[in-house]
Amino acid sequence: MAQKKDYYEILGVPRNATEEEIKRAYRRLAKQYHPDANPGNKEAEEKFKEINEAYEVLSDPEKRKLYDQFGHAAFDPKYGAQGSGGFSGGFGGGFADFDFGSFGDIFEDLFEGFDIFGTSRRRKEAPRKGADIYVDLELTLKESVFGCEKEIPIYRTEKCSVCGGSGVKPGSAPVRCQKCGGTGQIRSRQATFFGEFTTIKTCDACGGTGTIITDPCRECGGTGNVRRQRRVKINIPAGIDDGQVITLRGEGESGIKGGPNGDLHIKIKIAPHPVFKRVGQDLYIEVPITFVNAALGGEIEIPTLDGKTKVRIEPGTQNGDEVRIKGKGVPNLRSRGRGDLVVKFIVEVPKKLTEKQKELLREFERLSSEEGYEKRKHFWDRIREAFS
């Protein structure tokens, strides 16, 4: 007779495995090698039997203790182990005398629809949360910076107000399903290698409810819910950014079997602005100025989201120079502060000049010195150093 395989090795767990680790390994293997998942596969049937034998011992603290001390001999009748907590008859006689007691909860989870213990329990559908609804909401840059209140239409399933969600016409009642006898389940027997199994399926006539609605509610047509449009108000906080999501609890689809409603998730989309660009908490604006403004300096009026304001141009301003106007940017969602407005100057050179303008510029050039052009002076200094 071939030597029995180690029970720990069968389940693929170490000898110091916890009860939860053993149970988890058993669940995985039992599902993999269950006869109903491997019809006609003798090797799978033997493996399934082996897995159950190992779990029967290792899931019981007393039996596991004996096995750790004496090995397979602890449960071999010829060694007299039966009186010490061993199996009554071992496994030689197949599954006729096999104790499935410790497997009930596991099989119930793994093989829903298979009643291997002959029970007739009916599993009730638990209350479930309704589905969430996802929508996009476009805002202007100004709305996102200062916040606002929006009202948007959404379509969602709600409990029928006429029948209260029962689907039955007020004043009438559902009748017992004749096909399943009110159990909500259809049972059939199936012969397998291990004996006769009873398969349980949801009744297709009543959908598992055990009752049939013969006089449905006219408002919902017997479904218990209706599809309606609702307008939902949303408070947009100041400083919200593109891509952020606002969640309104309980504004989603209606709950199932008395469960809570789902949630409404609003994803913010900020439309591009023709003048301003947002980067974090700051706003950026490009302001074109003449080369005369850049050279002489001065003060100009520019737009902000708060209204018009004046900004100073320093004499000698270069193309791309920036100035910051404090507190004219985007509010911080988590504090009271605001970012800045960053003004970038774009020095514009005229493409067309009159003869008089050209003459004046040539005169200006004759009167200019290298000292007035720092970048130009440094450039030629580097050239001279490089080739000297």
Swiss-Prot record:
A zinc finger (CR-type) spans 147-229. Its main location: cytoplasm. Zn(2+) 1 binds at C160, C163, C217, C220. Transmembrane segments: none annotated. Binds 2 Zn(2+) ions per monomer. The keyword Lyase does not apply. It comes from Caldicellulosiruptor bescii (strain ATCC BAA-1888 / DSM 6725 / KCTC 15123 / Z-1320). Participates actively in the response to hyperosmotic and heat shock by preventing the aggregation of stress-denatured proteins and by disaggregating proteins, also in an autonomous, DnaK-independent fashion. Unfolded proteins bind initially to DnaJ; upon interaction with the DnaJ-bound protein, DnaK hydrolyzes its bound ATP, resulting in the formation of a stable complex. GrpE releases ADP from DnaK; ATP binding to DnaK triggers the release of the substrate protein, thus completing the reaction cycle. GO terms for cellular component: cytoplasm. This is Chaperone protein DnaJ. It comes from the Bacteria. One of its GO terms (biological process) is protein refolding. Residues 6-71 form the J domain. Keywords: Chaperone, Cytoplasm, DNA replication, Metal-binding, Repeat, Stress response, Zinc, Zinc-finger. One of its GO terms (molecular function) is unfolded protein binding. It is found in: Cytoplasm. Belongs to the DnaJ family. Homodimer.
